[in-house]
Amino acid sequence: MTELKNDRYLRALLRQPVDVTPVWMMRQAGRYLPEYKVTRAQAGDFMSLCKNAELACEVTLQPLRRYPLDAAILFSDILTVPDAMGLGLYFEAGEGPRFTSPVTCKADVDKLPIPDPEDELGYVMNAVRTIRRELKGEVPLIGFSGSPWTLATYMVEGGSSKAFTVIKKMMYADPQALHALLDKLAKSVTLYLNAQIKAGAQAVMIFDTWGGVLTGRDYQQFSLYYMHKIVDGLLRENDGRRVPVTLFTKGGGQWLEAMAETGCDALGLDWTTDIADARRRVGNKVALQGNMDPSMLYAPPARIEEEVATILAGFGHGEGHVFNLGHGIHQDVPPEHAGVFVEAVHRLSEQYHR
């Protein structure tokens, strides 16, 4: 078992005592850092960066060299799984991700393979192993996947969407086809996350970026049900240590109670949910991660510190809080402001852990 020098992130997820509130940032390895842009240019394009274990490791470690973060997160993309299913992922300038062969019907679903994580997704596992080696036990490594619903939105829409009419048409006109797709994705994601854990990920997170576009009933049936299946199938212990699982549904603040029933260890909150309210509702069951508005990092340092203080006070004394943004950091945020944020979390949270 690798001895971790700093395990406060894992301890907080398990609601165990910590000295200060741990902090990391969604998309902490990314375009707001000048050094990331240099490595990205070296790789040529985004997927080449993901598929090169050494370069993926380099960008994973870059934010840790700048800031005293309490966790590293694997540099990858949620669309690696659909890509490995053969949908032909490519990136359109200004348009984001696209697929050459979107899923349109049950026959398309039946043809999709369940990818072997050590074969078609072997490059991700190589990156995990490389990052773990290079971290030298400094902080834990987080692995992740998109949720079945969120992955399905890209696969059926053929890329990003604003209104989600194509997948909602399938959901209401041909629910069987969508359930078949979600079931296949749940199996694929379970294998994928378990392979990341075996390769060295010490915690995992499921990103349900688009769960919030659903009605409550549809969220239960088409998103949460399949995340629950994944949580049930995950390795919860590895290398003599519990492997915590965090679920994050953007726009899912009204469903925290149902999410907490899945058996996950923590829930990610976006910035539209009040953390004090969330703790009252589910804090006796799960840890909470979040939840500063990423746009707050455009504010002057004093305002960033004030917001950090407000969120810490909202959560209050005791254990079970991992500080983060409510979604990914924006690409044009000044890197110094991210530094102010991280430093403020550690300095201002000490009083809540005495």
UniProtKB/Swiss-Prot annotation:
Q: Which Pfam families match?
A: URO-D
Where does it primarily localize? Answer: cytoplasm
Q: Which GO terms describe its cellular component?
A: cytosol
> So what does this thing catalyse?
uroporphyrinogen III + 4 H(+) = coproporphyrinogen III + 4 CO2
* Top enzyme category: lyase
This protein's pathway: Porphyrin-containing compound metabolism; protoporphyrin-IX biosynthesis; coproporphyrinogen-III from 5-aminolevulinate: step 4/4
Show the InterPro entries listed in the entry.
UROD/MetE-like_sf, Uroporphyrinogen_deCO2ase_HemE, Uroporphyrinogen_deCOase
Q: Where do transmembrane segments lie in this chain?
A: none
* Molecular function GO terms recorded: uroporphyrinogen decarboxylase activity
Cellular localization per UniProt: Cytoplasm
Q: Which HAMAP family match?
A: URO_D
Q: How does it assemble?
A: Homodimer.
Its function? Catalyzes the decarboxylation of four acetate groups of uroporphyrinogen-III to yield coproporphyrinogen-III.
NCBIfam families, A to Z: hemE
Provide the protein name: Uroporphyrinogen decarboxylase
Source organism:
Shigella boydii serotype 4 (strain Sb227)
